[in-house]
């Protein structure tokens, strides 16, 4: 199990309140299986993995926002394509 110091992660994010928000978002992504860990799991809990990713500079609020925007755009494009295919089938 890797040892994570919150102070190291706080320095990467800026303050402890934003750290909690970013770590919680990332841990939730990992927990539901939406994303794969960017660091070895080493039998750690998802919150520890999220903190290790933050500590190593692999994840921050801007990165999470950009990834979520990209995923949303991809989902919207897929939905639009599906609607177009349905509309074409009715003609």
From Swiss-Prot:
Pfam families: RNA_pol_Rpb6 (PF01192). The RNAP catalytic core consists of 2 alpha, 1 beta, 1 beta' and 1 omega subunit. When a sigma factor is associated with the core the holoenzyme is formed, which can initiate transcription. It comes from the Bacteria. InterPro entries: DNA-dir_RNA_pol_omega, Pol_omega/Rpo6/RPB6, RPB6/omega-like_sf. GO terms for cellular component: DNA-directed RNA polymerase complex. Its EC number is 2.7.7.6. One of its GO terms (molecular function) is DNA-directed RNA polymerase activity. Belongs to the RNA polymerase subunit omega family. GO terms for biological process: DNA-templated transcription. This is DNA-directed RNA polymerase subunit omega. Keywords: DNA-directed RNA polymerase, Nucleotidyltransferase, Transcription, Transferase. Promotes RNA polymerase assembly. Latches the N- and C-terminal regions of the beta' subunit thereby facilitating its interaction with the beta and alpha subunits. HAMAP family: RNApol_bact_RpoZ. It catalyses: RNA(n) + a ribonucleoside 5'-triphosphate = RNA(n+1) + diphosphate.
